[in-house]
Amino acid sequence: MTRIEWRYLAFDALSAAELYAVLQLRSEVFVVEQACIFQDMDGADAQALHLVGTLQGVLVAYARCFAAGEKFSEASIGRIVTRSCVRGSGAGHALVEKAISCLFQQWGTQAIRMGAQAQLASFYGQHGFEKSGLPYMEDGILHIEMLRSV
């Protein structure tokens, strides 16, 4: 597989086409594929640093990165998503590692918290995240908070 190109962009730095591609991918996976009706555009995108991964000009991986205090008291990663065509290729692992690096580069080495789909806890565990708290339902999908300590 050709190498994914990674970029970190503030909300205002996203072009209209890039923002459309991000929202389309998030909707494709979180709303359609997972059959989950929820308000994806939650008002938090403007505060996020957006990690976009493209393959031959097509958005295939994406995550939102937040400074401590924006979503949780710790820095956080959310809306972690890969296009189906790159799943199983290691793109998801690369995405999580890039998101962690992004947070550290922007705001220094620190703990990172996320609200993960419970079924993906072992995946995130491979990147140093540990379950933190009890599982909870969010938009009809079981989630659990996970913390990656320093």
Language-model features, listed with the residues they occupy:
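Conserved beta-strand in the GNAT
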Residues: V52, V58-A68, E74-S76, V81
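Conserved GNAT acetyl-CoA-binding A-motif
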Residues: V96, L103-A116
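Conserved catalytic-core motifs of GNAT/GCN5-like acyltransferases
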Residues: R113-G115, G125, E130-E145
